């Protein structure tokens, strides 16, 4: 299936000069949505994860059904102040600013093998920050999985050397 035909492009969002790739148009298409989950499940399974980590918020949309399909637990990585227990926190740079992410300190344990899921990788800042959080939990990063990769922004270069899965790439 060619997911590119389902992904909407929105110029100058969230600020001028950014071309936003909108995955929500895939979510509303039953075949596109099913293909995304089924294909990512197929590609993630050989990495032998013990948990799926989803990055707020579109990583939740993908990560929860992937964890379910794989028979694994799902761990959310959230923006500050959204998790009720003790957290690890990291600041990171975005394509269009900076932010912080948090994970519960007890969300992962030594021996856990984690695949991080999000809808899109651009500069790699969010994914790299999430890798730092996984390390702070003493878990092992097994890989990353994205639906969309913006290759021209070289996000892969900021990530640890683990498998990186993407279903659609743009230059």
Swiss-Prot record:
Its main location: cytoplasm. Pathway: Purine metabolism; AMP biosynthesis via salvage pathway; AMP from adenine: step 1/1. GO terms for cellular component: cytoplasm. It is found in: Cytoplasm. Signal peptide: none annotated. It comes from the Bacteria. It catalyses: AMP + diphosphate = 5-phospho-alpha-D-ribose 1-diphosphate + adenine. Its EC number is 2.4.2.7. SUPFAM superfamilies: PRTase-like (SSF53271). GO terms for biological process: adenine salvage; AMP salvage; purine ribonucleoside salvage. Catalyzes a salvage reaction resulting in the formation of AMP, that is energically less costly than de novo synthesis. Homodimer. NCBIfam families: apt (TIGR01090), PRK02304.1-3 (NF002634), PRK02304.1-5 (NF002636). HAMAP family: Aden_phosphoribosyltr. Belongs to the purine/pyrimidine phosphoribosyltransferase family. This is Adenine phosphoribosyltransferase. It comes from Synechococcus sp. (strain ATCC 27144 / PCC 6301 / SAUG 1402/1) (Anacystis nidulans).
